[in-house]
Amino acid sequence: MTKNILVTFDMQIGDYEHSDKYIFHNKTTDYNYCKQFWSLKKKNKLEEGVYWDNQGLNAISVYSTQEITEQETKTLKRLGVA
């Protein structure tokens, strides 16, 4: 049975801070969530739990993870939130 894991990311893109959400169907490590979300090619750690992008210009980290129901997943997708 697949799970619905709502992951909230914090990103530093240039001078801007940004947050985004994505729904994954398997529980994994914070690095693997970042790797899948940003297509990271290698583990380039800026500090504990924070990773550089492939160019070494922007940073990403997992802010939170939460298991959600199938109904919550459908609602978030319908609203375009995740």
Regions flagged by a language model, labelled:
Residues 2-30:
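N-terminal acidic leader/helix
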Residues 1, 7, 27-28, 64, ...:
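Intrinsically disordered/low-complexity terminal segments and short unstructured peptides
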Residues 39-82:
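Short, mixed-charge low-complexity intrinsically disordered segments
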